[in-house]
Amino acid sequence: MTRAELPERIETERLVLRVRTIADAEDIHVYTSLPEVSYPAGFPPVKTLEDEIYYLEHILLERNQKDNLPAGYGIVVKGTDKVIGSVDFNHRHEDDVLEIGYTLHPDYWGRGYVPEAARTLIDLAFTELNLHKIELSCFGYNLQSQRVAEKLGFTLEAA
């Protein structure tokens, strides 16, 4: 299996998707420390900025290398340089099947940023990584994520 790689930066109509760096840790920690963001995304709130830095420097990189996942992206509104969310492939089920995940700072909910970012990553992954299928999982109580899945055309396989 060849190494899964995507461009370091992608622009959409309203967003810049770019690989996250340690310089983004403070912006990322602002929303990953919030229970309303972390628990629906499947992780406990990130307690400290140091924990966020460790995640970016070690855990994320090691997971991506181990599972041969592309780097994923921070979501940035054009005209700013502030990471307000993320869109990633967080799990490889098979060589040609990845699972997508996303987070977003609550101040930006309801603006269509996650569907825009996720659609871009999905389209790119099918063309550049030759995927067969992309999966998305969310908790039953996470109605916002369910709406994103519907907007992206995902099909419910289990409830």
Regions found by a protein language model. Give the residues of each.
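Conserved GNAT-fold acetyl-CoA-binding loop/helix
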Residues: E36-H58
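Short structured motifs
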Residues: H58-I59, S86
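Acyl-donor (CoA/ACP) binding surface of acyl/acetyltransferases
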Residues: M1-S38, G72-A159
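A short helix-loop-beta-strand connector motif used in the catalytic cores of GNAT acetyltransferases and
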Residues: I59-G74
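Alpha-helix initiation/capping motif
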Residues: P45-T48, N64, H93, C138
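Secondary-structure boundary/capping residues
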Residues: V37, V46, Q65-N68, I134
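Hydrophobic residues in alpha-helical segments
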Residues: T32, A41, R63-Q65
